[in-house]
Structures are given as C-alpha cells and as structure tokens.
Amino acid sequence: MNKLSVVILAAGKGTRMYSDLPKVLHKIAGKPMVKHVIDTAKKLSAAQIHLIYGHGADLLKQHLADEPVNWVFQSEQLGTGHAMQQAVPFFQDDENIVMLYGDVPLISKETLECLISQKPENGIALLTVNLDNPTGYGRVIRENGTVTAIVEQKDANPEQLKITEVNTGVMVSDGASFRKWLARLDNNNAQGEYYMTDVIGLANQDGFKVVAVQAKDLMEVEGVNNRLQLANLERHYQRKQVEKLLLAGVTFADPARFDLRGELTHGKDVEIDINVIIEGTVRLGNNVFIGAGCVLKNCTIADNVEIKPYSVIEDAIVGNNAKIGPFSRLRPGAELSENTHVGNFVEIKKAQIGKGSKVNHLTYIGDAEVGHHCNIGAGVITCNYDGANKFKTLIGDNVFVGSDSQLVAPLTIASGATIGAGTTVTKDVQENELVITRVPQRHISNWQRPKRK
C-alpha cells in the first residue's frame, strides 16, 4: 500500500458567514469544521496533513495549536488549483495525495477509503454525487462512461448545465502526477482562477484514467458557505449520532432534542430526557437517568444514578446509586461516592463526598473532603479562599453540619461532630463535639413595631 498524505484547503474567508472568525473554525457539534476533517485524516493514518491557510492565520494556529499539521500559507486565494500548488513542494512522488476541504466537515473515513481503493495507477479517483438541482456545482463530463473533464458552472454551456452529476472537489492521485498537472494549470476561465478541476482534462490528455466514485450520503460532501448550511449539517450530524445511540439501546424522550458534542459510551437501560447536552468524553453506567436540560462534560457516571433536571456536571466522577439535582452543579474535581445525594442549588468543586452523605440544599463545597454518612445542611459554605490562596476543609464520618454554617478553611472536623445551625467554624473540631457560635436569643415583651410616618 502506498503511503498517504492529505491536503486540506482552509484558506477561504467565508464572506457569507458574516463573521470575523475564519469559516473553517465555525463549529459542528462543538468542534471546528476543519478539526472534523483533520480527525478524519488521522483515521486514514496520513503520513502528513498539509493545511492550506490564509485568512485568519493567527486564529487558525491558535485553535489548532495541538494538531499535527504542516502549515502551508496561501498569500492570495486564486482558486483551488493555486491552493494545491502551494503544497506541491511537500509531495513525495510515490505517495497518494488526498485533497479535502476544511468546510466539508462530515466526509467519512469509509468513503475516503473506498475512493482511495479505486484510484487507477498514475490516474485520478474523483468523488462525485448526483443532485436534483446541480446549480452552482462543476459538472462531470463523460465520454462513453469515462470522465474526461469537469466544467465549472460559469464556464458550462447549456447542454452541460443539464448534467446532474457534479464534482465534490474530493480527489486522490499520486504525488508525481499531481505535481506534473498542477504545473500546467492556467487561469484562462471566467473567474480568472486556477481550477483544480482542470487536472481532470490534463490527465485525459496524458492518457491516464479518471475514475468517478459516487458518494452514498449527500451530506458527507455538503460544504458550508453560510450559517443556514451550517445549521443543516449540525442537525444531520446530530440525527446520525442519535440513531446510533437508539440502535445501541439508549432511550430518548425526543431524539430531536439532544446534542452530542463529543463521545458518549453507555451501559444498558439509559434514559435521556429532552434538551440534554453531552460534551467531551462522557461515560454512563447501567440504569442511568438524565433529566431535562442537563449538561454533562468529561464525566463518569456509575450505575443506577439519577440526574434530575437542569444539573451541570463537568470533569467529575459520580458513584453508584447517587442522586443529583435538580439544579446541581458538579465542577471539575468533584467526586461523589455511592449512595450520595446532592440536591438543588448545590455546587461542589474539587471535593470528595463520602458514601451515603447528603448535601441537599443551597450549599457550596469546595476544596474539601467529606466523609461517609454526613449530613450537610442548607446554606452551608466551605470558605476556601482568603483572597489570595485556597485552603482545604476536612470533614470526618457521621458529621452533622447545621444550616447556614460557614466552615472557614483550613479546617478539620473530626468524625461524629455536630455543628449547630448558624455557626461560623474557624478552629478544628474534635470527635463527637458540638460546636455552636450562635448569638444568644433575646425575648422582648410587648414589642411595638415601627409605624409609617
């Protein structure tokens, strides 16, 4: 098998997006379009990924800083052929070169593998598609079934405009052939540009075969020029993801109201209500229920967990049989053991909650360790920040913390301790102690309320 490299054209401005952001950085499923294409190139085990860039160079490099791409600058956007010419110095003669586009994000590894497998020796394999309305696309010209040329819309005659088979722009040939044909391109056309499609005619002139492979899924080769097209591809992508999950046994209250912006793995009997968003890498165990409006990002959820509506979980771990929400927030570093309860308007950050413990109402637990079978009352705050540094709160097992208490870190509360409601704790608490700092209650008889003047 020949070595393979990929060229991704990503230099365009995207005027019709009406945005300062380069077009290829607009997102599908929470990921820049060009990143989808790069990920597909990686799946092909490409030896090199050449990224042709121009407009928005700094933003592109910022967003793709961790990607293994060869940055190839195109100072002027003079057509697809001109873009490919910039990458020619990096081609090896005996490698296959696949040409892709940063604004065609849903092209699949399987489709490209099929295309590559059909490439004739020293020839070209071209990805095409039949459209009911081919307006705007380059028409595929055939003679006796053989592809002889591609004519762009603005250069086509009336008979050619009737053709419904169109060029997707995706093609593969070897490095030596591309180098030879790209050197012979001219811009003698209505646009004054160097068309990559002209290499089809050059290949025929040289007696080399051009094979057309039809894409099975039209949406794989749909490009994005405006936000309507972007939204259509987003919905198509989400439908495909939901179909896979449904067939794998996940129940959705409404498949049209779910967004997957990453990777979801799951056990059996998972149920997901409406308007749930999954981001990053999320792992769900068996018998997990996710209520309406929840957002889960980079988290692991064990078996028999109930996540009630409008809870947000990010970079957290949740143990078996936990109950979360509604309106709970688990921030990075939150770890809930089995049989824990975290209730409404509770925020937990960088803290471990022991098995059987409950934090049910209006509470902030940050930079803390809470032992087993504790009860943290409503309105409790771990005061972990002094304006410059963070400090930790350690709570043992079987601790009861009364409502509206403040735990000023650094602080240790030993097992079995009880903190009375309304207490501000500033010193360590020993085992089985009761701590209370409440102001003494006063009773004033025959109190007269103030009267309005």
UniProtKB/Swiss-Prot annotation:
GO terms for cellular component: cytoplasm; membrane. UDP-N-acetyl-alpha-D-glucosamine binds at residues 9-12, 23, 74, 79-80, 101-103, 138, 152, 167, 225, 331, 349, 364, 375. Residues 1-227 are annotated as: Pyrophosphorylase. Binds 1 Mg(2+) ion per subunit. Residues 249-453 are annotated as: N-acetyltransferase. Its main location: cytoplasm. Its EC number is 2.7.7.23, 2.3.1.157. Pfam families: Hexapep, NTP_transf_3. Acetyl-CoA binds at A378, N384, Y385, S403, A421, R438. Homotrimer. NCBIfam families: glmU, PRK09451.1. In the N-terminal section; belongs to the N-acetylglucosamine-1-phosphate uridyltransferase family. In the C-terminal section; belongs to the transferase hexapeptide repeat family. This is Bifunctional protein GlmU. It comes from Histophilus somni (strain 2336). The lineage of its organism: Bacteria, Pseudomonadati, Pseudomonadota, Gammaproteobacteria, Pasteurellales. The gene is glmU.
